[in-house]
Each structure stands twice: as C-alpha cells, then as structure tokens.
A protein has these predicted regions:
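Alpha-helical transmembrane segments of multi-pass small-molecule/ion transporters
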Residues: 1-302
Length: 302
C-alpha cells in the first residue's frame, strides 16, 4: 500500500506541472532555468542530505556496496550502448533510449520504497549503492544525451561538477563517520527536497507542449519502457544472484534500478539544447506504468 501511495503522490506532482504550464506559469525559458537550478544546486544538496541523518551505515560495508554499485553500472553500460540499436535506427534516439535504460529515478521513488520494504536503515545502503549513479549520469549520461560518444569527448571538468563534488563529500562524511550539525543539515535537506517536485513539474511542463500523439508515445517508447522497468532490473538481479551477492544487497540494488526513467534526462535535454520529446515520453510512460510494475517486481524478489 505504501508503494502505491508513493506512486500516486508522484503522479499528482506531475499533473501539477502540466497545469502550471497550461496556466502560463511555466514555459521554455523558465523550464530551462529551473533545470539548471535543479542540476547545479538542489541535486547536490539532495546528495549531501542523504548522509546527514542521525545514523550512518556500517563503514565496513562502504566498499562492498560501492563495488556492487559500480559493477551494476558497468552492466548497465551494455544496455545503454548496445540494446538501443535494436530499438531505433536513429543515432540521437539511440542515445536517449540508452539513457533511459541506464538511469532510474531513485531519489524520490526509490528510497521511500526501499524503506517500506526493507526498513529505514536500508535507505543508507540504497544511497551507497546509488552513489556511482552520480558519476555515471554526469559523464556517460551527458554523453548519451548530447549524442557525442568516445572517451576523448568526455570533459574531465564534469568530475568537478556540483553533483560530483557533493558525492565525494558525502562519501567522506560516511567514511569518517561525521555527523553533520542540525543547523547545517536542515537547510541542506530543505534545499535538496526541492529537487524532486521541481524535476517532475519540469518534465510534465515540457510534455504539455507536445502533441497528444507524442504524449501517448510510439512503439519504441513502450519497448524502451518495458526494458527499463522489467528486463534491466531482473537481468541485473539474476546476474548478481549467480555471482553470489548477498540476497539483501541484491534485492535492494534491484529495487533501486527498477524505478522509472531518471528525470535528469529531460533536465539534460533542456540544458544542452537537445529535443526533449522522446525523453519526456519515456519518462512519462515509465512513471505511470511503474505504479503497477514496481509492486510486481518487488513481489518477484520475495
């Protein structure tokens, strides 16, 4: 029931973004500025706030969890760069679909669902498992959205992006068991909490300007959505099960990557001047479909 409530809350925020666009409060220029604020300000705050709670995870689990997290994204690289060529022949669309297959919306949906299934302490483990996401989404993710491939096209400055700096800082706080004073933790958490509603409203606002035919989505959108919500997480689950990863870690990791398409896809499209049509379609369809698929996937893991 809690899983369903989380998904309904998310859907309400998405609908709000649509209404704000239709009423004239949101539009192209506003959405672009808000996207930049989310990427450069509120997202780093959200990352830091994930390690500013009253409890910190067992330090002995940091490296194993980070290792599983990085291996997960190595596996997802195969999905991101190889599978899309079987879904679309268009190079730009392949990049967008690759992003959708690699990156899930963990921040708002993933953590609450992990908490409801495995207990509050599991959120810390989910945060560690998802930490490599920050590195890959701001490197490989940007590469896929921009349609510029190859290591030589990877800008080293991305390692100094606000989100990456926040991820490094968060890792240090956990490694050295630093408990952040409430005077600092509370404002950081408040700013970080802006990320999810802002990102979701931007997604729906951008979709409000699309023709109804595009909102409904094409066959390739539904194929990509099925891969995103079912094939990708279950493939990773069974692979790591064979490799001997503990059941708890494997289950948490699977739930984390079984979420809808990451909202950063639309943010990146707007920031880098790319067409957000396909990305917003996949984000919208997976968000709506996940109301049913997430409970189903979690049941399969029990």
């Amino acid at each position: 029931m809690e899983n369903l409530e989380v998904m309904v809350i998310l859907f309400i925020i998405v609908v709000l973004g649509y209404a704000l666009c239709k009423l004239g409060y949101m539009g192209d220029k506003f959405d672009q500025k808000l996207s930049s604020i989310v990427i450069d300000v509120t997202c780093p705050a959200l990352i830091l706030s994930s390690v500013m709670g009253t409890e910190l995870p067992d330090r002995s689990l940091i490296l194993p969890l980070l290792g599983v997290g990085f291996l997960t994204y190595v596996v997802l690289l195969v999905f991101g760069f190889w599978v899309p060529r079987f879904v679309s022949k268009d190079r730009d669309e392949q990049g967008m679909i690759g992003f959708a297959l690699m990156f899930a919306n963990v921040g708002f949906i993933g953590y609450p669902i992990v908490s409801s299934i495995f207990g509050p302490k599991a959120v810390f483990y989910a945060a560690l498992l998802n930490m490599p996401n920050t590195f890959f989404i701001f490197t490989v993710g940007v590469m896929l959205v921009k349609g510029v491939y190859g290591v030589k096209n990877l800008n080293p400055k991305v390692l100094l992006s606000p989100a990456m700096i926040a991820a490094f800082a968060a890792a240090l706080l956990v490694a050295f068991s630093v408990h952040t004073p409430d005077l600092i933790a509370r404002p950081v958490t408040m700013v970080g909490n802006i990320t999810v509603p802002a990102a979701l409203m931007v997604i729906r606002s951008s979709m409000a300007r699309l023709p109804l035919r595009e909102v409904v989505g094409s066959v390739k959108v539904y194929v990509a959505s099925f891969l995103r919500l079912f094939v990708v997480p279950l493939s990773v689950y069974f692979l790591f099960k064979v490799c001997g990863v503990s059941d708890l870690v494997n289950q948490i990791n699977t739930v984390v990557i079984a979420m809808p398409v990451a909202s950063f896809g639309t943010m990146f499209c707007m920031k880098f001047g790319r067409s957000a049509s396909l990305m917003t379609e996949m984000t919208f369809v997976t968000t709506v479909a996940s109301i049913l698929t997430i409970p189903l996937v979690t049941m399969l893991l029990q």
